Structures are given as structure tokens and as C-alpha cells.
């Protein structure tokens, strides 16, 4: 029984660690993507506003 116990525990621990890493990676990627998207949207909106303002004059 003790021969089976440590590998099972290690596998479980590794699974938790892997899950944490994946969750963290997904969170970081989504945060960066969101921030970049917001920044690009703001820049695009600003340039579009400036373009329309320049052309209206």
C-alpha cells in the first residue's frame, strides 16, 4: 500500500500544479489581449475622430 500511495499523491499534486499553471497562463493571456484590444480600440477611435474632424473642416 505505501508503495502505491506516494506516486498517486504526486500525480494528484502535479495535476493541481498543472491546472494552476494553465489557469494563470489563460488569465495572463486574456488580460494582455483585453488591454491590447482596449488600447487599439481607443487609438482607432481617436484617429477616426481626428480624421472625421479634419475632413469636416
Swiss-Prot record:
Presence of keyword Nucleotide-binding: no
GO CC, alphabetical: host cell plasma membrane; membrane; virion membrane
Subcellular location: Virion membrane; Host cell membrane
Keywords: Host cell membrane, Host membrane, Host-virus interaction, Inhibition of host NF-kappa-B by virus, Membrane, Transmembrane, Transmembrane helix, Virion
Membrane-topology descriptor: Single-pass membrane protein
Pfam families with a match to the protein in the record: SH
InterPro entries: SH
Family named by the database record: Belongs to the rubulavirus small hydrophobic protein family.
Protein role: Plays a role in the inhibition of the host NF-kappa-B pathway. This inhibition occurs at the receptor level, by preventing the signaling of TNFR1 as well as IL-1R and TLR3.
Protein name in UniProt: Small hydrophobic protein
Organism: Mumps virus (strain Belfast) (MuV)
The encoding gene: SH
